[in-house]
Amino acid sequence: AYPDSPILVSAVTVGGYNMAKQIIQEADAIIYFPLDMPFVSESFVKRIQPRIFMPVETELWPNFLRAIRERNIPVMMVNGRISEKSVKTYRYLYGIWDDMLNTVSRFCMQSSIDADYISHLGADPKKIYVTGNTKFDQTYAEVTPEDLENYKKELGIENAYPVIVAGATPVSYT
């Protein structure tokens, strides 16, 4: 068990990979997730031999999950989320979704809406928990002037405008 178990983190996008390298320093390795093709998934799972698979958000890949299930490796979705649009699309893929959802032993969803959506797709309600968005639990490094300029560009904020950030702090934190 952790901390004696190695941690392998995978990402699908370049942005996800770079973010993982920046904020998950406990990982023993960070890789790009393998293509979800039967041979590739089988080979990867056989080589890595994971003790547990924890997909983040809704990264469920049918061939990979099949390879995991065949080896009785537990699966727990963390920070699960699913959009209304995705629910409408996914319900037409019932056979595939039913198979994938039955492989997952715990669904830790961001919100009650996400929990309802995953239940609507066929996940067992007894396996669904609302745990909140774990991205809010992260601590980030100081923002560099370059990062600040990039954020301003992304948000369309010009330098002349003041920026007000409002938040709430629970009484238990003070």
What are these regions (language model features)?
Residues 1-130, 134-138, 142-143, 170:
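Active-site and donor-binding regions of nucleotide-sugar-utilizing enzymes
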Residues 141-156:
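A short helix/loop element that forms part of the nucleotide-sugar donor recognition site in Leloir-type
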Residues 157-165:
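Charged active-site motifs of nucleotide-sugar-dependent glycosyltransferases
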Residues 173-174:
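Conserved small/polar residues in nucleotide/adenosyl-binding loops
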